[in-house]
């Protein structure tokens, strides 16, 4: 093995060792420190808000019953189906009890031994079971058979009208609530996916934070707009501690951040400049930061014209410094564009400055050198004083 081959071999071993050490350091920070100090999220990766309201008085809780429609829509499916079944069974039983009372007051029950030529309020109600079945037939409108109302009692006629109207209201409300629950744009938001990790690398000569987002449906989101909020704990000059201090984070794509053409996966990025809250962070100190980056995507569903919002969040362990996303869009032989979602969240390591301040300081130094303000080739030397020429 010659000297040149040995030097190449040493360089290769050194590069592999540095990369292995970097991966081990990243794994150690993520799995050891990440587990020992689990960060609290305001927004989960799926977009659910992790917030709990405590010490809410009874008067404030009553507001939820005033806005009963929104309360029913926000119920989980198991509670909604419980309310659905309880509403129908409860109304059938309640009106069955009222029909039994009508028959009892009018002495139509067999225990009163009514004469054969006497016309009852409701024919063939012999007890609570038959009264419940008559209530079910009335409210569901399946048609009368053996039991029916006569014109003998005005109370029975009024109760029949009242139950029919109330049954229509219950049917409309409960069926409408289930239909609205199914058609909520929240379900459309499930087909919008974000990358598990955010990356920081150079893009267009600038240091950027990049996130990949994809629409799993072929139908578009009209008027899509994407933005972010950086949540962290800050202390004001007056000494006040703000737990969830919000800072606006502007995200753009190459075509701008308004009216995105969201037909294929997009890589959105935030430029880390002097106005960015990430400007003073570095690769070595990123995992030690305490922040949460919440990303929002607003748009209008093309098929229903309903507005939906998709949310996700990133904590420092989920931001990879010095990586970029793998390309996933290719062109087939048939002339179609193919998206490989197998590599949607995959990243590759790239050469990246370890801090934004270093990148911009280097650019400023180069600019000063071009203008002659900082020229290392210019050397100032002392000149000996000479006497004036004597005449």
From Swiss-Prot:
Carbohydrate attachment residues: 117
GO cellular component terms, A-Z: monoatomic ion channel complex; plasma membrane
Residues that coordinate or bind ATP: 223-230
Segments on the Cytoplasmic face: 1-77, 178-391
Record flagged with keyword RNA-binding: no
Catalytic activity: K(+)(in) = K(+)(out)
Example of a GO MF term: inward rectifier potassium channel activity
Domain of life, source organism: Eukaryota
Record site feature (Role in the control of polyamine-mediated channel gating and in the blocking by intracellular magnesium), residues: 171
SUPFAM superfamilies per UniProt: E set domains, Voltage-gated potassium channels
PTM comment: Phosphorylation at Ser-44 by SGK1 is necessary for its expression at the cell membrane.
Notes on activation and inhibition: Inhibited by WNK3. Activated by phosphatidylinositol 4,5 biphosphate (PtdIns(4,5)P2).
A Pfam family matched in the record: IRK_C
Localization in the cell: Cell membrane
Membrane topology: Multi-pass membrane protein
Intramembrane segment ranges: 128-139, 140-146
Chain span(s) of sequence motif Selectivity filter: 141-146
Membrane-spanning intervals of the chain: 78-102, 156-177
Region (Polyphosphoinositide (PIP2)-binding): 180-207
Residues that bear Phosphoserine: 44
Subunit description: Interacts with SGK1 and SLC9A3R2/NHERF2.
Similarity remark: Belongs to the inward rectifier-type potassium channel (TC 1.A.2.1) family. KCNJ1 subfamily.
Protein name: ATP-sensitive inward rectifier potassium channel 1
């Amino acid at each position: 093995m010659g000297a040149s081959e040995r030097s190449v071999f040493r360089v290769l071993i050194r590069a592999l060792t540095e990369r292995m050490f970097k991966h081990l350091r990243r794994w150690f920070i993520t799995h050891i420190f990440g587990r020992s100090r689990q960060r609290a999220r305001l927004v989960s990766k799926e977009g659910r808000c992790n917030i709990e309201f405590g010490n809410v008085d009874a008067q404030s809780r009553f507001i939820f019953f005033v806005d009963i429609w929104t309360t029913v829509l926000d119920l989980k499916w198991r509670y909604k189906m419980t309310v659905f079944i309880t509403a129908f069974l409860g109304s059938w039983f309640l009106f069955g009890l009222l029909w039994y009372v009508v028959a009892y007051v009018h002495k139509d029950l067999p225990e009163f031994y009514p004469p054969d030529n006497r016309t009852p309020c409701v024919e063939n109600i012999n007890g609570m079971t038959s009264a419940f079945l008559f209530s079910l037939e009335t409210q569901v409108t399946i048609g009368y058979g053996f039991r029916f109302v006569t014109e003998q009692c005005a109370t029975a006629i009024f109760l029949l009208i009242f139950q029919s109207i109330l049954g229509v209201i219950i049917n409309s409300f409960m069926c409408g609530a289930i239909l609205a629950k199914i058609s909520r744009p929240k379900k459309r938001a499930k087909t919008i996916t974000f990358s598990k990790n955010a990356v920081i690398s150079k893009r267009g000569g600038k240091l950027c934070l990049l996130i990949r987002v994809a629409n799993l449906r072929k139908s578009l989101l009209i008027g899509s707009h994407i933005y972010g909020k950086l949540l962290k704990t800050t202390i004001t000059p007056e000494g006040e501690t703000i737990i969830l201090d919000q800072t606006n984070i502007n995200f753009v794509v190459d075509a701008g951040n308004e009216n995105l053409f969201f037909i294929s996966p997009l890589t959105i990025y935030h430029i880390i400049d002097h106005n960015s809250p990430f400007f003073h962070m570095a690769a070595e100190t990123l995992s030690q930061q305490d922040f949460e980056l919440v990303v929002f995507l607003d748009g209008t569903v093309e098929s229903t014209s309903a507005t939906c919002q998709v949310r996700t969040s990133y904590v420092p362990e989920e931001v990879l410094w010095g990586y970029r996303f793998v390309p996933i869009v290719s062109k087939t032989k048939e002339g179609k564009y193919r998206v490989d979602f197998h590599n949607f969240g995959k990243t590759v390591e790239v050469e990246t400055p370890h801090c934004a301040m270093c990148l911009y300081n280097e650019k400023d130094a180069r600019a000063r050198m071009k203008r002659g303000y900082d020229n290392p080739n210019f050397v100032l030397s002392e000149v000996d004083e000479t006497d004036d020429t004597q005449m």
